């Protein structure tokens, strides 16, 4: 390609492109062709930069090589970069370092920074954090924005220098003010965390916003986080979703996952679960563990996609391979239940242990349950209690309830109803329905606490309104008998109905009694018999006995001594 340069001897504009009407540097209108003999090193650097921008890497390498041969520092640096990236030449870190060192010795700031990077990461030279910081410092003295940012990172982390967050903030600020986007991002984080400066969410958001204006994916994502959580601005779900989408379109996996959550839940956008699955999939395929987990849940539950245990197991396994605690837990549950995989409680235990080792209380609780039942492990109440206690002390409500039950019935510990009530209370305070019901039982009968029937009813109601069948039955009984509340047969029958339809055998029995006696409902012996039979099939002895009486007395048709005897025997 033919070379032309500006006729003006003071102007060094040179190009292989089509000759412009006017020189972009001096405004001159005349250009001269060149065979290269009249060009100086700086001209070859300019031509190399032009060739590199055009993607003509072979030409760029040749141009930079000419400049470097004349000892031009910029040419040496750019030739070193070609060796680093393998553009126009075979990639070679040692050659890159050699050229960076030559240029750095002449004071070229870019080369000094590049050489520092090589030392920091051991590219072409032995790793040497102190040498890295020293070269970053040389370049930073010349106000090179990238070097200022790199040196700031060293001061942030104490890499090659003593940690000095305040100095880091100073350097990030200089670099950010010069327009270096990574420095803007890092400075925002320092303000957000209050490291090296007073915590200032407004300043953090301002710097993230400036970086986001340059389409920096991570900064866009962080803006989304700030608007979602109300850091430095009022909570704005719609604006958060906009930032997530912009970052997601740049293929930033965490943003893809967060935008998917917005779509799945309808937070800040119109709910669209199938589209959420598409975004989860994009992030999951990039290896984002949280997205892999969320995608697995979608496949397990059939949310936004047809239910598929195979895909659920695949994505739980992918996230578990990255040691995501919740994925380890859910995959363990699949193995424990045989959902989508062959039932394998031993494998479940291994997965639960990996999750528990990362501090996941729910996993400790599952381990406790395996030992309680002797499922895949030798049955051991003391071991079960130990795991329940670890999870309970971490504030996990189901484990607190389980530990309370162990104390109430003396399983793995000495029976202690007061301790039982304490642990039930901790779980009940978190709104855990089973614990509310158990604590209600304690108050109804004065077990471990002073008898307080109104408090019992209050707790039963809280659990019953969450749909717990046992609590619905207990509330129905209190309402029927006027225990801790005014007697109300109709309300009692309604609570028994809910309990019975929820599959609780005692609720079925009590509902049958209502129909037998006309308590709160119209007397109906046929319905009474149906509910007694359902309760009996669930294994409730009282229902079996009642059916025996009915068949013996002929309440449900002709007397049938054989049927009566069969139910009595059961």
Positions of the model-derived regions?
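Short helix-capping/linker turns of helical repeat alpha-solenoids
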Residues: 39, 69-73, 85-87, 92, ...
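Residues immediately within or flanking Cys/His clusters that coordinate Zn2+
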Residues: 3-8, 20-21
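Cys/His-coordinated zinc-binding microdomains
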Residues: 7-15, 27
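Hydrophobic face of amphipathic alpha-helices that form TPR/SEL1-like repeat modules
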Residues: 44-51, 78-85, 114-121, 150-157, ...
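Short Cys/His-rich micro-motifs in 6-15 aa windows
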Residues: 27-36
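Short linker/helix segments within small regulatory modules
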Residues: 14-22
